[in-house]
Amino acid sequence: MAREKIVVAGGSTKSWKLLLGLRVFAFMATLAAAIVMSLNKETKTLVVATIGTLPIKATLTAKFQDTPAFVFFVIANVMVSFHNLLMIVLQIFSRKLEYKGVRLLSIAILDMLNATLVSAAANAAVFVAELGKNGNKHAKWNKVCDRFATYCDHGAGALIAAFAGVILMLLVSSVSISRLLINSKHLSTTATTTAVV
């Protein structure tokens, strides 16, 4: 008995499993980045001035909401996580459905848009993290990470997860585009075969 190759949802079962696995990992990476950054907060009491020998202390809090780039980072990672979760659910529950060109095209476009979105958010957050770590002597912005080390470490962890999400979303986009190309070749050969018959 010869084994038949099962074609599922615009590609082979191998590409279906690969895409599902990549989406699951991209979902976990972007969700982890969003959660770590959204819970990133550190409060410290610091000496802000000295009058004579009397130190004046203030309690300062570093949190992600203070920086618009970090807020964008959290929102973008949540949006990409939601997109991946939705695509995972659709991929699992509509496995038997035949994907036509428009549906595959819209999925590929959404994947590319989400890869761009998470990349932009991660790069904006890296820019602000660099300012927090090293400051800017020309603008007279002091560094923050020497005082809020835990805050900066958590932010670095979120950035690592986000860049893993960027790489995974680029791979998801590549697989989505290849499935679209395979489907269009399959449709064109089917149309040619029917036209000849």
Swiss-Prot record:
Q: Which UniProt keywords apply?
A: Acetylation, Cell membrane, Membrane, Transmembrane, Transmembrane helix
Q: Which membrane topology describes this protein?
A: Multi-pass membrane protein
Keyword Metal-binding carried by entry: no
Q: Which residues cross the membrane?
A: 18-38, 70-90, 107-127, 157-177
Binding partners and assembly: Homodimer and heterodimers.
NCBIfam families xref list = A_tha_TIGR01569
State the similarity comment. Answer: Belongs to the Casparian strip membrane proteins (CASP) family.
Against PANTHER family, the record matches this protein to: CASP-LIKE PROTEIN 1U1 (PTHR36488:SF8)
Protein name in UniProt: CASP-like protein 1B2
Species this protein is from: Arabidopsis lyrata subsp. lyrata
